[in-house]
């Protein structure tokens, strides 16, 4: 299996044992990558829920997902995506995730229902 990209929401589903986590099988998880931007998003959401920042960072890393740096090419792709995703209200974090997937030619896993309407050139799997 080739690389797959996890959105922050997919990682949070794993960490918090939320509905849909069962769709992220071991086979899928062992090939997962995440943008550094989205890893920061995971940590931020955990801190907002009351976690200590250091513990939140360790928890985010505990998923054993490979972290990819946010490159200038991905930044350009994320900027370009505003034209086709603005009507869906996607954040910079969302577009960063999609930019990584586009750069890698990899499918994306997310919990965001709105994403199933996106046509960005890569498969999008909504896990719940």
Question: Which residue stretches match the model-derived regions?
Answer:
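Short, well-structured N-terminal submotif of metal-dependent ribonuclease cores
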Residues: 1-34, 46-59
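Conserved beta-strand segments of alpha/beta enzyme cores
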Residues: 31, 66, 123-125
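Short, hinge-like loop/turn segments at secondary-structure boundaries
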Residues: 49-53, 85-86, 125-128
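Acidic, PIN/NYN-like endoribonuclease modules and their adjacent C-terminal/linker elements
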Residues: 3, 41, 98-128
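A general alpha-helix detector
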Residues: 41-42, 60
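Active-site neighborhoods of divalent-metal-dependent phosphate/nucleic-acid chemistry enzymes
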Residues: 66-109
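Alpha-helix capping/helix-boundary segments
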Residues: 10-11, 38, 74, 96-97, ...
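Short secondary-structure capping/turn micro-motifs that flank functional sites
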Residues: 62, 94, 116-118
